[in-house]
């Protein structure tokens, strides 16, 4: 620790840490593919007529699902990844055919502000020969190419994540010292929930790119003490992309809107510039998610199917379940303690009214998310719905009266690193013939069928 005090944090220190995390996660991102190496799975014949109609029904995640059969399960080994729902990205993109001007993904849980950029990423990789794609039969017969597609889809999310970290670093520098910003961003990079979801093809961590861009723009307006038309337009686009990727991020947009309205009331900001933001945000949301309106029937069918999973909780226990089962495992026990301190400090000791408003908003969101996710309250990954808490809490903490902020962040970093360490090992074990229960199961299936 004494050595760290002598280091004058420069930007390149942050760049080095971000690059190190990127390299490590890039190596880890190609995981969960060795099941297809077994002869039975490699050589089995799959009847495409028996594998269902997900590529033709109106809602990919609808009710029109055919019964299970051997061909369908073998197809899943060839075309699905180890991560639940990653294949829905591929199904949705497979329904989009630009040459025929067909852009409806027929899957809407992952927003268009995420799916369309992911599709553009794949189109670029295909053009330069990094990935190969074909029709359904070709993909089934070339499962190694499917593995490549999943790998580079995860890399797309990883790129977004490290860029979001860079934005967070520069945002925090507007409110605090370079050392504070460096420590906070490093914690952000190694947090368990971010380690997990930065190499999974889902929109939650990807949306942090737009969340942190919104906060970065806000920090520019705060430091300049004015909101220009350009900043308003940029803020509207970034919020629209954040919500257009993950609709629950609308709660984050409300927090940002409250901050902007508060400052507009207490400054000489032109009110028209303030209202540009929601207008542009809504416009961007509609542009990136047009088919929830154009193909409303499919959207309703998907929502109906998803509603079968959920019920609204009404008991305080669900709040405790959310914190104990998702927030602490996801954010880390040390950051959770820091979050509690930052919220209480802002509510009871801060002289900044806006800090109190933001803190009360976060508490309200915790209760709201806890109750609407009551049916899955035992899951450990629900913190993905509130990832925007992380940068907000660090900003609140930077305003606290605590004189030992750097020391506190060092402790949080150390404890978070210890808590995240098993995750790094888990990715190694996932492809280990000695430790992976999934691979051992595949080996057993292979051996049993080879005896027949």
Please name every model-derived segment.
Residues 15, 130-140, 168-190, 229, ...:
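Transmembrane-helix signature of polytopic, membrane-embedded enzymes
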Residues 21, 184-189, 216, 239, ...:
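Short helix- or helix-capping micro-motifs
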Residues 1, 8-19, 237, 254-258, ...:
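Signature aromatic-anchored transmembrane alpha helix within multi-pass, membrane-resident enzymes
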Residues 173-174, 178-179, 214-232, 242, ...:
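Membrane-interface transmembrane helices that cradle and orient dolichyl/undecaprenyl
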